[in-house]
Amino acid sequence: MEGDLEGRVALVTGVSRRIGIGFAIARDLLAAGARVLVHSWAPHDAEQPWGADPAGTDGVLAALGGIGPRLAHVAADFADPEAPARVVAHAVETFGALDVLVANHARSSIQDLTEVTAAELDLCWAVNARASVLLAQAYAAQHDDSRPGGRIILFTSGQHLAPMSRELPYAISKGAVQQVTLSLADALADRGITVNAVNPGPVDTGWADPELTRSVARALPAGRWGAPDDVARLVRWLASDDSAWITGQTINSEGGFRRWVM
């Protein structure tokens, strides 16, 4: 598949850690020949238990080959409703077009029904759901339909398959992405732009504690969590011409995850 995205321009959001899903996606799209704008918002990771990448943003970009003719970077907080349009505009200003949007960013939140606050509900909704729609809106407004390969790839986390009662703000906002996918796919189908969502299942990006890591691994037939590379391969295919007949789908790439045995 080397070179199958030659001439295409991609935006990948949520590229903030070298062990993260966004990093693996950006690396694979670059390897396939695309020019890529990566987005990050390091303050979010810094306030989470797993922390920001110790190498910082510069280290993440260096690991992708460094800023140059095929790689650019933008930092933005998607809690700001104007940020999605600015990020898309930056991609077009930098590379002259935008063909592939990968909305991989997320705000994580651990709050159950007794703990949940209006502020956290609003913030997760703004980042996870609203920003995904506004990114798609800005993407569609600038897209040149004469260019091949119009792709929007969103991310959910299996909320349509099982409850996540300990993570209500996250689960509710990410669960909405499945309906966003269906509706945007219909809205953009006549323009030749496909819209799909990826549910990557449990992926080891360093966030889980040892007990959860062991418990989830027992529920996966391979005996291991998914890896960022597993997700990146799927996204690379969805970004390619080979996926042109697929739209409006939420693809569950979970390695046969048996939730019921946990």
Give the location of each predicted region:
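Active-site helix of classical SDR
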Residues: 136, 173
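Conserved NAD(P)H cofactor-binding loop of Rossmann-fold oxidoreductase domains
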Residues: 104-109, 256
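Short, small/polar-rich loop/turn modules that mediate ligand/substrate recognition or access, typified
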Residues: 189, 194, 246-248
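Active-site Tyr-X3-Lys motif and surrounding loop/helix of classical short-chain dehydrogenase/reductase
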Residues: 86-93, 111-115, 119-126, 215
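Catalytic Tyr-X3-Lys loop
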Residues: 107, 114-133, 153, 177, ...
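Canonical Rossmann dinucleotide-binding motif of NAD(H)/NADP(H)-dependent dehydrogenases/reductases
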Residues: 3-39, 43
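Short C-terminal tail/terminal secondary-structure segment
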Residues: 162, 214, 218-219, 236, ...
